[in-house]
């Protein structure tokens, strides 16, 4: 976890980055044989707790488009690993015709989404390896922050 980055006004804020988008080659490999994708990203735990968008979602959408895949939709959810909140938000979020869901978050978010949908779910990000607590999950699930997500 990267800490103590300077804020725009010069004050110090914590950087809670816990994951990063997988490399382009690995994503291209995972995308093989998939289409009609829904992309969901955790909008917190990626950086400073500010109201800004998760940056990897746009980058992943670009890669998916370049691979010739159809995106059925995308969403950014605060604290994706919070099962109660995510379940409520996901109910009507994923459009009919979606065949695969790609999750941009740490392993907790991937596992939370996988438990809630009836299509294959893939990790599009790797957790950053650090000591400390991952996510805000109130379950027994865990993310080992291994820096190479093997949930696919």
Where are these regions (language model features)?
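Iron-sulfur-associated redox domains of electron-transfer enzymes in respiratory
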Residues: 2-152
């Amino acid at each position: 976890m990267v800490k103590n980055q300077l804020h725009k006004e010069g004050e110090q804020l914590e950087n809670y980055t816990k994951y990063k988008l997988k490399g382009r080659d690995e994503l291209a490999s995972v995308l093989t044989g998939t289409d009609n994708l829904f992309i969901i990203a955790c909008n917190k735990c990626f950086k400073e707790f500010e109201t800004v968008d998760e940056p990897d979602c746009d980058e992943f959408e670009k890669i998916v488009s370049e691979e010739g895949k159809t995106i059925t939709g995308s969403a950014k959810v605060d604290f994706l690993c919070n099962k109660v909140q995510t379940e409520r938000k996901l109910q009507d979020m994923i459009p009919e015709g979606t065949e695969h869901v790609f999750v941009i978050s740490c392993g907790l978010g991937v596992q939370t989404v996988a438990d809630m949908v009836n299509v294959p779910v893939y990790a599009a990000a790797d957790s950053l390896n650090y000591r400390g607590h991952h996510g805000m999950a109130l379950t027994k699930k865990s993310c080992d922050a291994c820096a190479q997500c093997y949930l696919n």
